[in-house]
UniProtKB/Swiss-Prot annotation:
Annotated site (Cleavage): K91, S92
Post-translational modification: Processed into Adipolin fC1QTNF12 and Adipolin gC1QTNF12 by FURIN. Insulin enhances endogenous C1QTNF12 cleavage.
Listed name of the protein: Adipolin
Alphabetically ordered keywords of this record: Disulfide bond, Glycoprotein, Hormone, Secreted, Signal
Residues flagged as site, Not glycosylated: N287, N297
Residues modified by glycosylation: N39
Effect of C85A: Abolishes multimeric complex formation
Stretches assigned to the C1q domain: 153-308
UniProt-listed SUPFAM superfamilies: TNF-like (SSF49842)
Stored InterPro entries: Adipolin/Erythroferrone-rel, C1q_dom, Tumour_necrosis_fac-like_dom
Length: 308
């Protein structure tokens, strides 16, 4: 009894399974039939041999996304898109990063050719030319009437050398201006320009400039020696003064005592003075001793224009 029940149940299960299998087989056949239908086309012309076209639906089942994908697959591959992409990649790569640090310096270049050797003689000659140009430029401000055209005479346009005509007595405790000069006729003496007055012993500046002056006086103090012992305040001063105002303007001065054992001694004074145009200079002797002094006729007075 129990055996017959188990047999009937098994037979019923087999029938049910067979029916399900037949339904699955039928569905598979329908699917393959749809694949083999004329709606499926092969796109050999588009370069995809053997590819199948998905089934088309006539209803709302066909979506825009599906058609877009089909158009993308079927598009001609001409390589322009890849070129555009490569161009964009290069451009983006060129602008993406910051510039790097500068590279290391390169190796030094070859040494240059040796320079021209400069001798001390060449340097000295060049220095002399520079000095000459500077001197000519310094004197370029003088009036043309005072500058001769000859280059050898341009540096000294006013100069003089003169001597006393005769001895000059200087009384005790007095200040005397020396006058009465003469231009020596011996070789070596000179008188250039028109600024010197020999009779007055005065030189008048033709232009505002710097001048050099010198006076060399031979003093005879034999009378003072005969009086015995000299005092400490017995001395003589020689001055070159501007406008006869020795204490108001700058003056050149030399002081000498009278303790010399010789009968005649020499007092010299020299230096530079700046004179305005029209000012004059002259030589003065200040005798502070208690006896008369004699300035011998060999005493001299000289001067020259240096520059503006």
């Amino acid at each position: 009894m129990w055996a017959w029940g188990w047999a009937a149940a098994a037979l019923l299960w087999l029938q049910t399974a067979g029916a399900g299998a037949r339904q699955e087989l039928k569905k598979s056949r329908q699917l393959f039939a749809r694949v083999d239908s004329p709606n499926i086309t092969t796109s050999n012309r588009e370069g995809f041999p053997g590819s199948v076209k998905p089934p088309e639906a006539s209803g709302p089942e066909l979506s825009d996304a599906h058609m877009t994908w089909l158009n993308f697959v079927r598009r001609p591959d001409d390589g322009s898109s890849r070129k555009r992409c490569r161009g964009r990649d290069k451009k983006s790569r060129g602008l993406s990063g910051l510039p790097g640090p500068p590279g290391p310096p390169g190796p030094p270049g070859p040494p240059g050719s040796p320079g021209v050797g400069v001798t001390p003689e060449a340097l000295l000659q060049e220095f002399q030319e520079i000095l000459k140009e500077a001197t000519e430029l310094r004197f370029s401000g003088l009036p043309d009437t005072l500058l001769p055209q000859e280059p050898s005479q341009r540096l000294v346009v006013e100069a003089f050398y003169c001597r006393l005509k005769g001895p000059v007595l200087v009384d005790k405790k007095t200040l005397v201006e020396l006058q009465g000069f003469q231009a020596p006729t011996t070789q070596g003496a000179f008188l250039r320009g028109s600024g010197l007055s020999l009779s007055l012993g005065r030189f008048t500046a033709p232009v505002s400039a710097i001048f050099q002056f010198s006076a060399s006086l031979h003093v005879d103090h034999s009378e003072l020696q005969g009086r015995g012992r000299l005092r400490t305040r017995d001395m003589v001063r020689v001055l070159i003064c501007i406008e006869s105002l020795c204490h108001r303007h700058t003056s050149l001065e030399a002081v000498s005592g009278l303790e010399s054992n010789s009968r005649v001694f020499t007092v010299q004074v020299q230096g530079l003075l700046h004179l305005q145009s029209g000012q004059y200079v002259s030589v003065f002797v200040d005798n502070s001793s208690g006896a008369v002094l004699t300035i011998q006729n060999t005493s001299s007075f000289s001067g020259m224009l240096l520059g503006t």
